[in-house]
Amino acid sequence: NHVDGIEKGGELWIKGPNIMQGYIMPDNPGVLVPLEGGWYHTGDVVEIDEIGFVYIRDRIKRFAKIGGEMVSLNAVDEMVRKAYEWMGGEFDYGVVAVPHESKGEQIVLVTNNRHVEQDVLHSYIRNNGMSELFLPRIILFRDKLPVFATGKADNVTLKKEVLEELSAKNSVAA
């Protein structure tokens, strides 16, 4: 299915006897809410090649909608990694989208590396023909970022923490 702002691919919908029948909602226990037309919306952005292989490229929820354009937060993650490859070593960072008054959303980069600078990221974007939309508008520094026991980034907790921090800063500025 087409996803606004995604040029190649779309959202994967699946249907079949092995797919769940629907959802049981907490506000109406015991009542099954069937899937629309029997189709399950996976939330995965996929591309299908010329011979029919399906490639999962991203998650719909890992996008920022900035001024009507969809920006992949995974692509921003990758851009940050590549922009700082020259430093060697590992550092932690996460990218989240938060509300923006006029543009819909904005990208926030959170890292434990105090050498990460917007100028370096901006140069990387410019030198690699990327859109300015990929540039994080805010960079926050933390000693530790939230992760699951597996070591994978906990983006839900990170976004919550970022929203709390930005809200506190706006309260002080007001």
Where are these regions (language model features)?
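Short proline/glycine- and acidic-rich turn/helix-capping motifs at secondary-structure junctions
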Residues: 102, 138-150
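Conserved ATP/PPi-binding loop(s) of AMP-dependent carboxylate-activating enzymes
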Residues: 1-33, 69-71
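Short, small/polar residue-rich loop motifs at catalytic or cofactor-binding pockets
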Residues: 35, 40-42, 140-141
